[in-house]
């Protein structure tokens, strides 16, 4: 039972047993053999007893693991004890409004499609189990903030850098040669009580190189729609400039091999109308030199049509998009908390097209509302997304119902179910 895959399956088997029970409740005596059958094991595993602890008292570890899964499902709000009936548990009607963080060791396939899976659990517990080559890791990490958001984070720079490196390390080991890692990081981090910016980003780039051998390909600027900030230093004290962008740090494990994988022709942008007229009129009309001869113009230059404009390393994408609006509607319908930091689908879409081909595996180890998974799904890439907060992954599942092969784990139906039924 030490296999992470078997532990993941055991957790799912326990949840499903209650879903399939006629009255949604089971005694532990009824539950144990059902789980054994679903796991494809011999019933003898329920009889094996081994010494435990200093006293050496003999216990059945398989039954203990099942009870551990029960307790986890209880924390999710999926299971509850039946009052006055010892050892009897029942499927709850709905999870609550608070965020439910996965306990250490919990790994549940919350939902899946033909192309990907969304897993509820800690990425540190799940990434070690990925057993195939990864072409791209694209993830928006919890930001380094003085006051962490509801979804977590740390305020200590050194701890934050170590946190990122530890979360990435198992993925680096599974990255294909020339594969890419793209990390969305804040540019709005300041020294405590001062208007001077933190240099955590620069420290992180160096640490990722020294510790994990990751080379910096680019620091792509994502310019979104931001409220004025930093509020105190820009709006109150009038010292700082308002921040307008976030980092998307693009890294690779092999800059020589990435030449065979990245292709900017997959993300060409439309030419402007003025450029199209310029080309149609024959391009450059006269000879000229600029910058001490470093730039030369010759008649006829830029007169040949091209399929598009090469993208720059500044992405101008507003935060609102149809996919985000759909997620918000789904979360409200299920009466679940809404994620406080979402990016438009265009951002992961851009990097997935640039750095992968159809059929490649894309991983997001801080899945949030599973934006990376949705972008990968639409682009016919395989995907794995891991999210620590139950309510985020549950609400995200609704957007995938139209995808081929969609399956929502039965235990997830109970999360927010009361609101969905009331409003349905």
For each predicted feature, which ranges?
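S-adenosyl-L-methionine
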Residues: 107-127, 401-424
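Nucleotide-sugar donor-binding patch of glycosyltransferase catalytic domains
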Residues: 390-396, 402, 409
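Alpha-helical residues within the helix-turn-helix
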Residues: 33
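Accessory beta->alpha helical hairpin/"wing" motif in late/C-terminal subdomains of nucleic-acid enzymes
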Residues: 81-103
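Positively charged, polyanion-binding regions of nucleic-acid-associated proteins
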Residues: 2-30
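Nuclease-adjacent, charged terminal/linker segments that flank catalytic cores
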Residues: 2-5, 69, 84
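Core catalytic lobe of class I
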Residues: 30, 41-49, 58-63, 67-69, ...
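Residue-level detection of the helix-turn-helix DNA-binding "recognition helix"
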Residues: 36, 71, 398
């Amino acid at each position: 039972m030490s296999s992470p895959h078997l532990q993941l399956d055991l957790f799912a088997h326990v949840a499903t047993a209650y879903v399939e029970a006629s009255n949604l409740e089971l005694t532990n005596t009824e539950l144990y053999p059902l789980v054994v059958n679903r796991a494809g094991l011999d019933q003898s595993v329920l009889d094996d007893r081994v010494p435990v602890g200093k006293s050496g008292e003999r216990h059945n570890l398989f039954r203990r693991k099942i009870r551990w899964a029960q307790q986890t499902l209880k924390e999710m709000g999926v299971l509850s004890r039946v009052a006055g009936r010892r050892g009897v548990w029942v499927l709850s009607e709905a999870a609550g409004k608070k965020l439910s963080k996965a306990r250490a060791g919990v790994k549940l396939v919350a939902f899946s499609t033909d192309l990907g899976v969304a897993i509820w659990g800690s990425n540190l517990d799940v990434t070690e189990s990925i057993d195939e080559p990864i072409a791209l890791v694209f993830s928006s990490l919890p930001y380094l903030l003085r006051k962490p958001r509801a979804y977590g984070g740390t305020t200590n720079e050194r701890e934050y850098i170590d946190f990122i490196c530890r979360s990435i390390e198992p993925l680096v080991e599974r990255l294909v040669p020339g594969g890419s890692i793209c990390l969305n990081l804040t540019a709005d981090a300041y020294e405590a009580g001062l208007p001077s910016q933190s240099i955590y980003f620069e420290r992180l780039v160096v640490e990722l190189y020294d510790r994990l051998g990751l080379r910096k390909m680019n620091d792509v600027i994502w310019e979104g729609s931001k409220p004025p900030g930093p509020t105190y230093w820009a709006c109150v004290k009038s010292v700082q400039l308002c921040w307008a962008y976030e980092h998307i740090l693009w890294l690779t494990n092999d800059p020589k091999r990435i030449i065979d994988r990245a292709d900017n022709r997959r993300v060409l942008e439309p030419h402007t109308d003025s450029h199209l007229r310029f080309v149609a009129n024959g391009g450059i009309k006269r000879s000229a030199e600029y910058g001490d001869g470093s730039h030369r113009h010759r008649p006829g230059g830029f007169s040949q049509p091209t399929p598009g404009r090469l993208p720059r390393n500044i992405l101008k994408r507003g935060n609102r998009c149809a996919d985000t609006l759909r997620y918000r509607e789904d979360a409200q319908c299920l009466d679940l908390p809404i994620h406080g930091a979402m990016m438009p689908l265009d951002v992961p879409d851009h990097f997935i097209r640039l750095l992968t081909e159809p059929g490649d595996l894309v991983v997001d180890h801080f899945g949030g509302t599973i934006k990376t998974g949705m972008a990968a799904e639409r682009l016919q890439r395989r995907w794995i997304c891991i999210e620590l907060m139950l309510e985020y992954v549950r609400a995200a599942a609704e957007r995938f119902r139209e995808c081929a092969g969609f399956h929502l784990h039965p235990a997830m139906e109970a999360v927010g179910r009361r609101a969905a039924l009331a409003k349905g």
